[in-house]
From Swiss-Prot:
Main location: membrane
Protein name, UniProt field: Endospore coat-associated protein YheD
Gene3D superfamilies to which the protein is assigned, alphabetical: ATP-grasp fold, B domain
Subcellular location: Forespore outer membrane; Spore coat
A GO BP annotation: sporulation resulting in formation of a cellular spore
Functional note: Involved in sporulation.
Cellular component terms (Gene Ontology): endospore-forming forespore; membrane
Family: Belongs to the YheC/YheD family.
Pfam family, any one: ATPgrasp_YheCD
Source domain of life: Bacteria
Membrane topology: Peripheral membrane protein
């Protein structure tokens, strides 16, 4: 049956009993479940209960329910499931309950609060918080008075929010993911960062997305630099596993050779002339392994007030597991910046700020939405595991053609600092939990649909 939302409370006059509204009456109900915790109990019905479900105090605690809340009730296979219980997986914990995730504490508090307001239970955890023998986790929950630790069951579904690739590659974290997925059949979404080159290859092979892609090659060489710089006004060399616009080089052919612009990790901008590709590559190799980089065709982007502009488009799966476009923003290059990243001095504008003409604005929305949804479907078809959100960087050239530069499985959220984009910030977060609810329900009612043999 479809889940329905109820207030979850405690009955202090009974023992080991789950009280349901009469509207949910079914024969043969034997168990109550919360997350992966299942307890045999007596199920009774009360006519006066309409939007409330009550549990005997001992049953409430045995199921490890952390507090009264609003949650979905899903009845399947003689069991009443309360939830969903969503675990947000991360790393980088501190001992402080005031700021348990350092600078990310505010982000996680908003995420947990948003989910619990919508219905269900949500906590943050890491590999070290799992008690494998007991099948429990010491999770961090955010309540009115701040962060608190509670022992909860293993969750119905995991939303991966590891902060970076280096941490993701930890053997402990890889083992933790594998064990929860393989042994406990817990759906885990956005479980890896995308590799730029792997994504490019997947999209390039599919006729639905190949037309969006600028020419890209792995491992810049003298021959490739000469060829691409001869064919295009600008060429970019970027890390295959980069983030936030770091480590990117812009190459332009000149009468005297090459001009190379770069913003380093310290955000210092440089522009250096080289006599030829060989001299640049020799200097480049002193600091980098070329096989970790790709070389990409530059695109003559549309401009806003004389500065190049591109677009961040977010897609999320919804409560039905369907892709939706949740946010579109314009990113405008900063002074002396070779990218539009905010970390390199770029600025964010809404579409309405850039396109005065409503008809033109609608046309841009249609173009970008169609491209983003198509790319989302293709990546879903070809990448193993569950994907619930993607952040795309698109460009539109001077001729109106759409180009796709990047896809990120854990997109940055700096665009949402714009005051007119706060509402879509909440929407993208809400969609992630809608998809978590979808995965949780499917894992309970039809696991074969999630993990076909």
């Amino acid at each position: 049956m479809n889940p329905k939302r109820f207030l979850i409370g405690i009955d202090k006059t009974s023992e080991n009993t789950l009280f349901l509204p009469s509207s949910l009456k079914q024969d043969g109900l034997l168990h109550a479940a919360f997350g992966t915790k299942v307890v045999r109990c007596h199920v009774a019905y009360r006519r006066h209960l309409e939007q409330t479900v009550l549990l005997s105090e001992n049953l409430f605690h045995e199921l490890l329910l952390p507090h009264r809340s609003r949650a979905d009730i899903l009845i399947h296979d003689h069991t009443v499931h309360i939830g969903p219980l969503v675990g947000i997986f991360t790393a980088g914990f501190t001992v402080s309950l005031e700021r348990p995730f350092k600078d990310r504490s505010l982000f996680f508090s908003k995420l947990v609060t948003l989910h619990e307001q919508a219905g269900g239970y949500c906590f943050v955890f890491g590999a070290h918080q799992i008690n494998w023998e007991e099948g429990t986790i010491e999770g961090l929950l955010y309540r009115e008075n701040g962060w608190e630790k509670k022992i909860v069951p293993l969750p119905n579904v995991v939303y991966d929010r590891l902060p970076n690739r280096k941490i993701e590659d930890s053997l402990l974290l890889q083992h933790t993911k594998k064990r929860l997925i393989d042994e406990y059949q817990i759906p885990w979404f956005n479980k890896t960062f995308f590799n730029k080159w792997n994504v490019h290859q997947l999209l390039e092979k599919d006729p639905r997305t190949a037309p969006f892609l600028p020419r890209s090659e792995l491992t810049p060489s003298v021959e490739l630099i000469d060829e691409l710089c001869g064919a295009y006004k600008k060429v970019y060399i970027k890390p295959a596993n980069g983030a936030l616009g770091t480590g990117i080089y812009q190459l332009t052919r000149t009468d005297g050779g090459l001009t190379v612009k770069h913003t380093n990790d310290a955000k210092t901008f440089t522009s250096i002339d080289y006599s030829d590709a060989a001299s640049f590559l020799a200097e480049f190799q002193k600091h980098h392994n070329p096989s970790d980089f790709l070389i990409q065709q530059g695109v003559d982007l549309i401009e806003f007030q004389g500065k190049p502009a591109d677009f961040r488009v977010h897609t999320n799966k919804n409560r039905k597991g369907k892709w939706t476009v949740t946010a579109i923003a314009v990113k405008i290059s900063g002074k002396n910046s070779i990218t539009t990243h905010l970390s390199n001095g770029g600025t964010v504008k809404t579409l309405a700020e850039v396109y005065d003409d409503p008809a033109e604005r609608v046309e841009v929305i249609k173009k970008l939405s169609a491209a983003a949804l198509t790319a989302s479907h293709v990546l879903h078809d070809h990448i193993e595991g569950f994907i619930g959100e993607i952040g795309f960087d698109f460009g539109i050239d001077q001729n109106g053609k759409v180009w796709m530069f990047e896809a990120n499985s854990r997109p940055g959220r700096s665009i949402f600092s714009h005051p007119n984009l706060h509402h879509v910030d909440s929407l993208t977060k809400r969609r992630s939990f809608e998809y978590a609810s979808y995965l949780s329900e499917k894992a309970i009612t039809s696991p074969e649909a999630l993990w076909p043999s």
